[in-house]
Amino acid sequence: MGRFLLVTLSLLVMAFFLNGANSCCCPQDWLPRNGFCYKVFNDLKTWDDAEMYCRKFKPGCHLASLHSNADAVEFSEYITDYLTGQGHVWIGLRDTKKKYIWEWTDRSRTDFLPWRKDQPDHFNNEEFCVEIVNFTGYLQWNDDSCTALRPFLCQCKY
């Protein structure tokens, strides 16, 4: 019995420290993931204003970049839980050259692009910023006018 209690207690302590290692430095209400902290903001902003808002937290903060299906699923659940409205959500991807060359604001690799069907399309030659689409369960992306007002997802390295 004593050995079982010791093993159980050791496992609980280890789980506590492992969980703390991932979330110890994120501000309250931010989601810890992959060494970054993420937060969805319900304020409606243009893509540029959203990026500037994210940058105000500290150097290295940007609109979020997503790099895997696991990221997409995690953020889908997080956005669904914390977004008070039902709008699409800005992320940190855009086509600054307007030639279907998509780049993240944090300069990370563009290695995951779960576009909605028939997207991106640069509709009317006006859509160069990327949003996560609400009616896909926040799992697929669309290009939209950078001046549209949207909630947004920030990421910061803490």
Curated annotation (Swiss-Prot):
Disulfide bonds: 26-37, 54-154, 129-146
One GO cellular component, as annotated: extracellular region
Domain C-type lectin: 33-155
Subcellular location: Secreted
Residues carrying a glycan: 134
Domain of life of the native organism: Eukaryota
Tissue expression per record: Expressed by the venom gland.
Binding site for Ca(2+): 119, 121, 127, 142-143
Major localization class: secreted
Cross-referenced InterPro entries: C-type_lectin-like, C-type_lectin-like/link_sf, C-type_lectin/snaclec_domain, C-type_lectin_CS, CTDL_fold
Key words of the record: Calcium, Disulfide bond, Glycoprotein, Hemagglutinin, Lectin, Metal-binding, Secreted, Signal
Span of the annotated motif Galactose-binding: 119-121
Functional description taken from the UniProt entry: Galactose-binding lectin that binds to and agglutinates erythrocytes in a calcium-dependent manner.
Family statement: Belongs to the true venom lectin family.
Quaternary structure (record): Dimer. Probably disulfide-linked homodimer.
Entry protein name: C-type lectin galactose-binding isoform
Source organism per UniProt: Pseudechis australis (Mulga snake)
